[in-house]
């Protein structure tokens, strides 16, 4: 009597393009800007007991939790070279783990990385003063119900930007495939605004947008 096969199914998100853009952005924000300095990046490697290969990006979060994004190549039931890509997103602690969606991954990353509006910005906006902080990860708020204060600060932030910055933001929306250049351009533009500009740091376009899933 033949022994039946046992399968372990996990949810993955199919990526239509290649993974170089995701890896380039993570490495740029880790080694160049320092926004993801605490992130552990495991480059593309072969899994010894399988025919597929993968890479790992591990985000340490608050407490003892972690968010891990694994990128798979050739993740198919058949052996052989098939140009297919997929990602798996897992949140885990020492005793528990679960798979999460890209929107949830954005929220988890923003809870630890990339600055957001501070409490004093509402008072500055009411007094008509220039904002000293801004949200570097606006996509992380898409899955949440935004407060009136947050919506008002977003409008003030958009109106306070120079025209060249608005043009750059429109370009980012039209072509989200330029994730690495997005971070570089935003970092340079804020360095040119003087001492009254918001805190330095790069924008993060969001996991789904960089990987072109659900975007």
Curated annotation (Swiss-Prot):
Its main location: host cell. InterPro entries: Vif. Processed in virion by the viral protease. Highly phosphorylated on serine and threonine residues. It is found in: Host cytoplasm; Host cell membrane; Virion. A motif (HCCH motif) lies at residues 110-141. Coiled coil: none annotated. One of its GO terms (cellular component) is host cell cytoplasm. It is a peripheral membrane protein. Residues 154-167 are annotated as: Multimerization. Pfam families: Vif. It comes from the Viruses. The modification Phosphothreonine is found at residue 98. Homomultimer; in vitro and presumably in vivo. Interacts with viral Pr55Gag precursor and human APOBEC3G. The interaction between Vif and APOBEC3G is species-specific, which may play a role in restricting the replication of HIV to humans. Forms an E3 ligase complex by interacting with human CUL5 and elongin BC complex (ELOB and ELOC). Required for replication in 'nonpermissive' cells, including primary T-cells, macrophages and certain T-cell lines, but is dispensable for replication in 'permissive' cell lines, such as 293T cells. In nonpermissive cells, Vif-defective viruses can produce virions, but they fail to complete reverse transcription and cannot successfully infect new cells. The BC-like-box motif mediates the interaction with elongin BC complex. The HCCH motif (H-x(5)-C-x(18)-C-x(5)-H) mediates the interaction with CUL5. Counteracts the innate antiviral activity of APOBEC3G. Forms a complex with host APOBEC3G thus preventing the entry of this lethally hypermutating enzyme into progeny virions. Functions as an adapter molecule, recruiting APOBEC3G to the ubiquitin-proteasome machinery. Targets APOBEC3G for degradation through the assembly with elongin BC complex, CUL5 and RBX1. Binds viral RNA and affects the stability of viral nucleoprotein core. May play a role in viral morphology. Belongs to the primate lentivirus group Vif protein family. This is Virion infectivity factor. It comes from Human immunodeficiency virus type 2 subtype A (isolate CAM2).
């Amino acid at each position: 009597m033949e022994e039946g096969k046992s399968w372990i199914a996990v949810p993955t998100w199919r990526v239509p393009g290649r993974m170089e853009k995701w890896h380039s952005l993570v490495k740029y924000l880790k080694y160049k800007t320092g926004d993801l300095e605490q992130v552990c990046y495991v480059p593309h490697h072969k899994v010894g007991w399988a025919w597929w290969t993968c890479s790992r990006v591990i985000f340490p979060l608050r407490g003892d939790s972690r968010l891990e994004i694994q990128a798979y190549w050739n993740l198919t039931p058949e052996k052989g070279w098939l140009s297919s890509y997929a990602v798996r997103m897992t949140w885990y602690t020492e005793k528990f783990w679960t798979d999460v969606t890209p929107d949830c991954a954005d929220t988890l990353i923003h809870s630890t990385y990339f600055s957001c509006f501070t409490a004093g910005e509402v008072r500055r906006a009411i007094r008509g003063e220039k904002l000293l902080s801004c949200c570097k990860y606006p996509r992380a708020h898409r899955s949440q119900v935004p407060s009136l204060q947050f919506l008002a600060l977003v409008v003030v932030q958009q109106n306070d930007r120079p025209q060249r910055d608005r043009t750059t933001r429109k370009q980012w929306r039209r072509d989200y495939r330029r994730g690495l250049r997005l971070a570089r351009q935003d970092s340079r533009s804020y360095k040119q605004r003087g001492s009254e500009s918001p805190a330095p740091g790069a924008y993060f376009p969001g996991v789904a947008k960089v990987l072109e899933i659900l975007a």
